[in-house]
Amino acid sequence: MSEMSLIMLAAGNSTRFNTKVKKQFLRLGNDPLWLYATKNLSSFYPFKKIVVTSSNITYMKKFTKNYEFIEGGDTRAESLKKALELIDSEFVMVSDVARVLVSKNLFDRLIENLDKADCITPALKVADTTLFDNEALQREKIKLIQTPQISKTKLLKKALDQNLEFTDDSTAIAAMGGKIWFVEGEENARKLTFKEDLKKLNLPTPSFEIFTGNGFDVHEFGENRPLLLAGVQIHPTMGLKAHSDGDVLAHSLTDAILGAAGLGDIGELYPDTDMKFKNANSMELLKQAYDKVREIGFELINIDICVMAQSPKLKDFKQAMQSNIAHTLDLDEFRINVKATTTEKLGFIGRKEGMAVLSSVNLKYFDWTRL
């Protein structure tokens, strides 16, 4: 059995997919798509090493200790070149995680022809009449190239060292004069590029798990500036001491959302040692944090917030706070609840030295079946 490693390309921006979630993080059952695709291929062969390119290594590492991860580049070729630095096996298989349903039959066809050329690649024939600039092309000569592809590692590295932009491994090796061998591709190995492609693939649907997060934040009164809660001005001069605008509710809610998704906390994302967050709009930071959560495949179910303050009274502001949160997070207002309480004059809150906020949220996997 030939020594071979596997590279899975999962660092793309999913621009053409055109949704809030990156397609590599769509959930198939409980697995993100990148993991589902990698598990599928890795079950077919005892790979020496499995390398996954990533735009979020810290998060992806939470799913498995069996793979190596490397930060992707700006292009496919750059990502592949970086991943190849970790490969020393004679052969390397490269695939896009967006090709989720590669079959064992296709995999075996690639392996069976390993000695035929420098790169073995699956390809589909074109059945329909094909035009280029209104001129009919000879469809018998057209091939739709797919992945996974198997290449001789040293030759693929040499091909990519030309620093030219190739959209797949076979064209890079062909440009070096290498021999390409085509095997029959399959419809199931078509790439998930546009959200409409989801309807063409028989994929497992997301599980119905719920993820709960809590956030707690405290700030001291003392700044002669507006007191903001959820971006709503509560008082013109009772501001809270903070590196940002002091919106303690926004900070608490941000932490709750990050926690439910497993993305750390607000201090990691927006450190108070970074001057670019000085006097920052906390509701804008909340939106950015939720965008990151949505990118990795989650969406909010509901929010419950308890503001603890002896003063000022907040009854008349709760509706405005709920509305502003709904607008910022693109969430139905009936899914948001803001409560206010005192501490019956006990503790630092009762002494009117500061205020605190406790937020709880529930997240679920993004339901891509609605697309």
Curated annotation (Swiss-Prot):
The record marks 139, 191 as: Positions MEP for the nucleophilic attack. In the N-terminal section; belongs to the IspD/TarI cytidylyltransferase family. IspD subfamily. It comes from the Bacteria. One of its GO terms (molecular function) is metal ion binding. Pathway: Isoprenoid biosynthesis; isopentenyl diphosphate biosynthesis via DXP pathway; isopentenyl diphosphate from 1-deoxy-D-xylulose 5-phosphate: step 2/6; Isoprenoid biosynthesis; isopentenyl diphosphate biosynthesis via DXP pathway; isopentenyl diphosphate from 1-deoxy-D-xylulose 5-phosphate: step 4/6. This is Bifunctional enzyme IspD/IspF. Bifunctional enzyme that catalyzes the formation of 4-diphosphocytidyl-2-C-methyl-D-erythritol from CTP and 2-C-methyl-D-erythritol 4-phosphate (MEP) (IspD), and catalyzes the conversion of 4-diphosphocytidyl-2-C-methyl-D-erythritol 2-phosphate (CDP-ME2P) to 2-C-methyl-D-erythritol 2,4-cyclodiphosphate (ME-CPP) with a corresponding release of cytidine 5-monophosphate (CMP) (IspF). The gene is ispDF. Pfam families: IspD, YgbB. 4-CDP-2-C-methyl-D-erythritol 2-phosphate binds at residues 217-219, 243-244, 265-267, 270-274, 341-344, 348, 351. It catalyses: 2-C-methyl-D-erythritol 4-phosphate + CTP + H(+) = 4-CDP-2-C-methyl-D-erythritol + diphosphate; 4-CDP-2-C-methyl-D-erythritol 2-phosphate = 2-C-methyl-D-erythritol 2,4-cyclic diphosphate + CMP. InterPro entries: IspD (IPR001228), IspD/F (IPR026596), IspD/TarI (IPR034683), ISPD_synthase_CS (IPR018294), MECDP_synthase (IPR003526), MECDP_synthase_CS (IPR020555), MECDP_synthase_sf (IPR036571), Nucleotide-diphossugar_trans (IPR029044). Residues 1-210 are annotated as: 2-C-methyl-D-erythritol 4-phosphate cytidylyltransferase. NCBIfam families: ispD, ispF, PRK09382.1. HAMAP family: IspDF, IspF. GO terms for biological process: isopentenyl diphosphate biosynthetic process, methylerythritol 4-phosphate pathway; terpenoid biosynthetic process. The keyword Cytoplasm does not apply. Its cofactor is a divalent metal cation. Its EC number is 2.7.7.60, 4.6.1.12. Residues 211-371 are annotated as: 2-C-methyl-D-erythritol 2,4-cyclodiphosphate synthase. A divalent metal cation binds at residues 217, 219, 251. Keywords: Isoprene biosynthesis, Lyase, Metal-binding, Multifunctional enzyme, Nucleotidyltransferase, Transferase. The keyword Nucleotidyltransferase applies. The record marks 16, 23, 243, 342 as: Transition state stabilizer. It comes from Campylobacter jejuni (strain RM1221).
